[in-house]
Amino acid sequence: MDAEKIHISVLLEETMEFLCLQPGGIYVDGTMGLGGHTSAILERTAPDGRVVAFEWDENAIKASRERLAPYGERLTLVRRNFAEIGVGLTEAGISHIDGLLIDIGLSSLQLDTGTRGFSFQRDDDLDMRMDERGEMTAATIIATCTEEQLADLFYCYGEERQARPIAAAIVAARKLEPIQTTKQLVRVVARAIPKRFHPKKIHVATKVFQALRIAVNTELENLSKIIDDAGEFLKPGSRFCIISFHSLEDRIVKRKFRENPNFKVITNKPVKAGEEELDRNYRSRSALLRVAEKV
């Protein structure tokens, strides 16, 4: 698979500029994915710059391995979530870094070619694990949570206003048969909401899928942890760039950057994609980049 053909890294130029890349620097890409940002950093810090790339999705690692092979020992790959930055850097023998980037969005590989239930456009098992070594799946949540727990999850993690009728419909439907695939879940959600309340700009199941993915992968907890811990490893004057894709994440980044005494906020408002990038890559429309500097 040619990773470069199926994925376009968002806000690439803006991120590279904010990182203030230096030849020979050591940088962390906390979400390697298909290697777009990783390779850009390596290209711009040649010949001696290094990247420690964190990635917990084995499929993404396999898809990007050939593309990144030419960088040889300049690239250190860590199969961990970015929340484990301390363990990963210690294993790599690195104590301090010159910059850190995380891009929290799903890759095209996961949305378009995956088989783990991230997309409601495909009929896959309700899995949603980024790291298939994990035990909890979306199907497990759907099958075991109470109606109240499901409603709270959809409201808190998906900001879904129809959380309660959706939760009630799921509990009723699972009494008849297990809900184990994406299409099953989509049908239940669509029927639970009167058509006049179906959102016009997004799919009716978008927020439910978002909530389940966040819960399965403890995404918000991981995001909070990396912001809390990053100051220990970033050198003074180095930059921390975070690209998020929905308001839940962005609010956490905004608040924690401002509250953390290790950081000075560089972007008071999130940086968004320009018209040219929007025309080239429609998935960039939701991208929000915030940057802080280690003091």
UniProtKB/Swiss-Prot annotation:
GO molecular-function terms, A-Z: rRNA (cytosine-N4-)-methyltransferase activity
Keyword Acetylation: no
GO BP of this protein: rRNA base methylation
PANTHER family: 12S RRNA N4-METHYLCYTIDINE METHYLTRANSFERASE, S-ADENOSYL-METHYLTRANSFERASE MRAW
Primary location group: cytoplasm
Organism: Desulfotalea psychrophila (strain LSv54 / DSM 12343)
Record-listed E.C. numbers: 2.1.1.199
Keywords noted in UniProt: Cytoplasm, Methyltransferase, rRNA processing, S-adenosyl-L-methionine, Transferase
GO cellular component term, pick one: cytoplasm
Protein family membership: Belongs to the methyltransferase superfamily. RsmH family.
Record function comment: Specifically methylates the N4 position of cytidine in position 1402 (C1402) of 16S rRNA.
HAMAP family on file: 16SrRNA_methyltr_H
Catalyses which reaction(s): cytidine(1402) in 16S rRNA + S-adenosyl-L-methionine = N(4)-methylcytidine(1402) in 16S rRNA + S-adenosyl-L-homocysteine + H(+)
Cell compartment(s), UniProt: Cytoplasm
Protein name: Ribosomal RNA small subunit methyltransferase H
Binding site for S-adenosyl-L-methionine: G35, G36, H37, E55, F82, D103, Q110
Pfam families: Methyltransf_5
Class of the enzyme per the UniProt entry, highest EC level: transferase
